[in-house]
Amino acid sequence: MKRNLLCIVALALAAVLCTGCGVKDEDLKSDPLVNADGTAPVGKTLVAPAPPEGFTLLDNKDILAANGLYYASWVNGEPQPYENSEGKTVNLYDAQLTLVVQENKTEEKAASAVSGWQELAQQNYDISDTQTLIAGGQEYTVIQFTYQDESNPYAFGVAAFGQKGTSAIEWELSCQESYTGDALAVLTEFLNGCTY
């Protein structure tokens, strides 16, 4: 069961990030869950801050809520059509920030999920830096990386892995070469603005 849930999470992340995706506009017609102040609750674990200048909430879904899996994403730049590895035309942005929250029954399961995500990152990315960051009172392991898969339209990124009680949390900012912002600063701003 634990392995199956980890596989589901890995497949969800791969579908979102590793295939060079984005999502079609018509797939985003569902009302995203956003508060009046621009903050976005993601599961029961956290409320993501209103996005910094230049970023827009693209999606906020409870993709597998029955399994405690929640997903949100923010984008920067204008959408550009892109044909992904599956032959589907999707929108691609200068940068896309993805948040995945997996709410578990135990802290051990949350720790296992975080560990699994970190292992996947080591397998799929060339990691140039790893550090511990405390933001918004929460400790994260932060990596900076480039993508190993040259067919991925995103060139580099930064990710943060953390655990809050029984919840596993992963933030990942994927950037094209054209992105001129400071990826680590943007991610840190999001992390500092979270409430748990």
Task: Name every feature range the model reports, one short phrase each.
Residues 37, 66-73, 136-144:
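Short, hydrophobic/aromatic-rich segments at coil-to-beta transitions
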Residues 22-24:
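Bacterial signal peptide processing site
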Residues 16-20:
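C-terminal motif of bacterial Sec signal peptides marking the signal peptidase cleavage site
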Residues 73-74, 154-164:
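Short, surface-exposed beta-strand/loop micro-motifs that present aromatic residues
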Residues 115-159:
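Signature of long, low-cysteine stretches enriched in small and polar/charged residues
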Residues 51-104:
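Secretory pathway targeting signatures of secreted, lumenal, and periplasmic proteins
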Residues 1-6:
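Positively charged n-region of N-terminal signal peptides that target proteins for export
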Residues 55, 169-196:
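Surface-exposed amphipathic alpha-helical segments
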